């Protein structure tokens, strides 16, 4: 198999080649951009193809002035010769810059924002609403509050103990000064530990979703309008035979918002995408946004997607993943009526076996890494009936058809 070429060049990207399948991918709330996901996809595609005895050429990531997407192409090699058509084109849809804009690094600002967030969560009914749908997710939402609350108690107890112990020996002023220095050191240590454990990342994601839930989504809505226009233009200029819109983690509700925006576009009816576009959500947390009563724009998006003719939508989650709403109907989560057959199609898969996590502690301590297992390939015996990259490389992925 040919190795993936270095990132950032145009070689290996051909604009007018016939494309069998184009994937538009939305990452979760992640400041890492296309370069990270290019390396992830390239490595996993290579591993999956090797397992199948296939030879692929994974092209370089296309350098382009368009800030909306980054693209790379995958072509089959047969007897050392490249196929004429492109087997797969991956388009990374950029909203990572919005994640970076909503990634404050000042601890004091984050703590101050937490007052309103956890006021709503604990006292405003958020915890109960989410707890009815997914108890593990509800407890996960409390984790930043519990971590920093316990660390604060530890810090104050240690600092007060040292200050009190030193007072008879060195006086009140010295004892207080040493206690203050210790408190500051422990606070800094706690913050670094929280970042290492992913607590701060989780809290930033909660903060962003809460802001969207308060209808503070103008920047994201503007981006979605631009992305919808870009997708329609691409599918008019060089249409792919099959189109897949994929959202991972928080990217799942962005995916739903974008799919609805596409349907609102005047060019939608002439694009032919209603016959070619399919939706795939991985490790979704749609209900994290849907439970907010002020998220009326998102509720309208869901209602539009439920209207006939519906876009085929497969939702893949796992009960082992405490950061997703495993098997939760996004429409039921916010009380929206959804007539007819269940929508989206919900599929639960096991993930713990992929990492040989055999007990609760091992499972709980690997949640952030496990949440990315949807974006990794696996041996068939461990895949739990779903392999994202095997699906992308299939000639006819029946499981995402109506």
Region spans (language model):
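N-terminal low-complexity, Ser/Thr- and acidic-residue-enriched intrinsically disordered segments
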Residues: 2-183
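Active-site catalytic motif of lipid deacylating hydrolases and related acyltransferases
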Residues: 31, 86-147, 168-239, 371-402
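Intrinsically disordered, low-complexity coil segments
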Residues: 78-84, 236-240, 265-275, 334-349, ...
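Solvent-exposed, charged interface segments at domain starts and junctions
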Residues: 2-11, 242-248, 328-329
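Lipolytic serine-hydrolase domain surface
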Residues: 31, 97-98, 108, 113-116, ...
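Contiguous N-terminal and early-domain "leader" segments and peripheral loops that mark the onset or edge
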Residues: 2-24, 197-219, 260
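Enriched - but not universal
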Residues: 75, 154, 279, 363-364
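Serine-dependent carboxylesterase/thioesterase catalytic core
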Residues: 22-23, 27-45, 213-323
């Amino acid at each position: 198999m040919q190795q993936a070429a270095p990132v950032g060049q145009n070689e290996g990207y051909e604009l007018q080649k016939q494309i069998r399948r184009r994937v538009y991918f939305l990452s979760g709330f992640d400041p890492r951009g296309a370069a990270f996901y290019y390396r992830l996809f390239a490595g996993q595609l290579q591993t999956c193809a090797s397992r199948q005895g296939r030879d692929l050429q994974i092209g370089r990531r296309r350098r382009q002035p368009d800030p909306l997407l980054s693209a790379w192409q995958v072509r089959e090699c047969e007897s050392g010769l490249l196929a004429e058509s492109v087997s797969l084109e991956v388009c990374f849809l950029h909203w990572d810059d919005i994640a970076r804009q909503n990634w404050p690094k000042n601890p004091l600002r984050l703590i101050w924002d937490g007052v309103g967030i956890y006021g709503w969560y604990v006292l405003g009914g958020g915890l109960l609403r989410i707890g009815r749908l997914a108890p593990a997710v509800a407890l996960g939402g409390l984790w930043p509050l519990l971590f920093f609350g316990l660390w604060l108690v530890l810090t104050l107890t240690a600092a007060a103990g040292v200050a009190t112990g030193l007072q008879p020996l060195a006086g009140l002023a010295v004892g207080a000064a040493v206690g203050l220095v210790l408190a500051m050191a422990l606070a800094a240590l706690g913050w670094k530990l929280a970042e290492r454990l992913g607590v701060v990342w989780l809290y930033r994601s909660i903060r962003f979703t809460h802001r969207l839930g308060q209808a503070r989504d103008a920047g994201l809505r503007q981006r979605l309008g631009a992305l919808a226009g870009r997708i329609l233009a691409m599918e008019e200029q060089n249409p792919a035979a099959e189109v897949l819109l994929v959202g991972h983690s928080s990217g799942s509700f962005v995916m739903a918002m974008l799919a609805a925006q596409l349907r609102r576009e005047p060019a939608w009816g002439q694009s032919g995408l209603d016959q070619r576009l399919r939706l795939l959500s991985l490790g979704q947390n749609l209900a994290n946004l849907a439970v907010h009563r002020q998220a009326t724009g998102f509720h309208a998006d869901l209602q539009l997607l439920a209207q006939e003719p519906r876009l085929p939508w497969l939702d893949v989650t796992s009960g082992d993943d405490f950061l997703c709403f495993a098997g939760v109907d996004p429409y039921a989560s916010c009380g929206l009526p959804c007539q007819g057959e269940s929508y989206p199609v919900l599929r639960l898969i096991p993930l713990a076996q992929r990492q040989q996590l055999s007990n609760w502690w091992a499972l709980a301590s690997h949640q952030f890494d496990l949440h990315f297992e949807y974006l990794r390939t696996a041996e068939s015996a461990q895949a739990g009936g779903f392999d994202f990259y095997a699906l992308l490389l299939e000639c006819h992925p029946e499981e995402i058809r109506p």
